[in-house]
């Protein structure tokens, strides 16, 4: 049976590394439109863009997306989702999928998968996905978030650092990917129950979240179990920098 869920796409205009990121053109479309189109191809009952900027609202109206204007002072995309869940009147047990607004190549199957994974793992209050890291440059890239899970597929931690650090292997060959270590790249997509979002906001950011700039660490800090599935179809990395934007444009022939 198909899992019922709502997709919310948090989208901020301000970006330190790429100002105006959601409205950057890829071909003849703003990036936020490509993300929304991919989300609409999933099994979601509803797809909503959540933004703090009227310019993004106007752009969304131009291509037919439902968009909600939120406060500007949210600490993370998940905090923004909590406001939207309240405005939409979502039931506490409703599944909400957070699709990052800078993932224009995200496969619809991945969106469906993370929603289904949350529904299937009652011990987890959040679900997300990962894929193997297969080259040393990706492993050492701080824009690539690494994740380590336990034997039950629950997250132990996330970091922008090389995680885990293969002490002996790197001492011998510091520029070679160690064999036998299942390094994984975290894919920035989350599923949660709407009721959990309100708990998340009430906790406020923790120092670890602020240090790494990774909102999921707030959940781990408070003992929340996060299920990490192996993505059936992994997207290319999202858009964080001007170089990333050019990479996506090349991939799409734009």
Swiss-Prot record:
Activates KDO (a required 8-carbon sugar) for incorporation into bacterial lipopolysaccharide in Gram-negative bacteria. Keywords: Cytoplasm, Lipopolysaccharide biosynthesis, Nucleotidyltransferase, Transferase. It catalyses: 3-deoxy-alpha-D-manno-oct-2-ulosonate + CTP = CMP-3-deoxy-beta-D-manno-octulosonate + diphosphate. It is found in: Cytoplasm. Pathway: Nucleotide-sugar biosynthesis; CMP-3-deoxy-D-manno-octulosonate biosynthesis; CMP-3-deoxy-D-manno-octulosonate from 3-deoxy-D-manno-octulosonate and CTP: step 1/1; Bacterial outer membrane biogenesis; lipopolysaccharide biosynthesis. This is 3-deoxy-manno-octulosonate cytidylyltransferase. GO terms for biological process: CMP-keto-3-deoxy-D-manno-octulosonic acid biosynthetic process; lipopolysaccharide biosynthetic process. GO terms for molecular function: 3-deoxy-manno-octulosonate cytidylyltransferase activity.
């Amino acid at each position: 049976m198909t899992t019922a869920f709502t997709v919310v796409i948090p989208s901020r205009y301000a970006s330190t590394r790429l100002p105006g990121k959601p409205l950057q053109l890829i071909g003849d479309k703003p990036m936020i439109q490509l993300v929304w189109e991919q989300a609409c191809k999933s099994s979601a009952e509803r797809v909503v863009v959540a933004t703090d900027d009227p310019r993004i609202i106007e752009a969304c109206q131009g291509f037919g997306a439902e968009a909600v204007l939120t406060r500007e002072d949210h600490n993370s995309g998940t905090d923004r989702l909590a406001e939207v869940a309240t405005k939409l009147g979502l039931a506490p047990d409703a599944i909400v999928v957070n699709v990052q607004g800078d993932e224009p190549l995200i496969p619809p199957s991945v969106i469906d998968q993370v929603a289904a994974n949350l529904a299937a793992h009652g011990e987890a209050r959040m679900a997300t996905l990962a894929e193997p890291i297969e080259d040393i440059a990706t492993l050492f890239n701080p824009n690539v978030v690494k994740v380590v899970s336990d034997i039950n597929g629950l997250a132990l931690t996330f970091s922008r650092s090389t995680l885990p650090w293969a002490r002996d292997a790197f001492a011998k060959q510091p520029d070679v990917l160690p064999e036998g270590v299942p390094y994984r790249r975290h894919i920035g997509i989350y599923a949660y129950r709407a009721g959990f979002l309100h708990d998340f906001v009430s906790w406020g950011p923790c120092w670890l979240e602020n240090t790494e700039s990774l909102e999921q660490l707030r959940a781990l800090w408070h003992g929340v179990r996060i299920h990490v599935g192996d993505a059936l179809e992994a997207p290319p990395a999202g858009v964080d920098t001007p170089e990333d934007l050019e990479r996506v444009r090349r991939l799409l022939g734009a």
